[in-house]
């Protein structure tokens, strides 16, 4: 799943560790989400979106459906 985490973190000047602390996970979890190696649970996705003051859909981008 693609995300806007790097862009949003840059806007707030947050490191991965700072975002991780805000949402209660390890820095490695944020790294794995950003690199597409891990899809967050729904509760974690909401926590991350809330940390940025965004809706989940503004942070996590669903791949386009293919015919």
Give the location of each predicted region.
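Recognition helix of helix-turn-helix/homeodomain-like DNA-binding domains
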Residues: 25-38
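Short, basic-rich loop-to-helix N-cap that marks the start of a DNA-contacting helix
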Residues: 37-47, 65-66
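DNA major-groove recognition helix of helix-turn-helix/homeodomain DNA-binding modules
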Residues: 43-58
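Residues in the helix-turn-helix
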Residues: 18, 29, 58
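Short, charged recognition helix plus adjacent turn
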Residues: 50, 60-67
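Short basic helix-loop element that most often maps to the first helix and adjoining turn
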Residues: 3-22
């Amino acid at each position: 799943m693609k995300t806007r985490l790097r862009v949003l973190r840059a806007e707030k000047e947050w490191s991965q560790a700072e975002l991780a602390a805000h949402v209660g996970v390890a820095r490695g979890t944020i790294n794995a989400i950003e690199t597409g190696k891990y899809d967050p649970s729904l509760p974690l996705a909401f926590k991350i979106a809330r940390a940025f003051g965004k809706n989940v859909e503004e942070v996590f981008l669903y791949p386009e459906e293919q015919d």
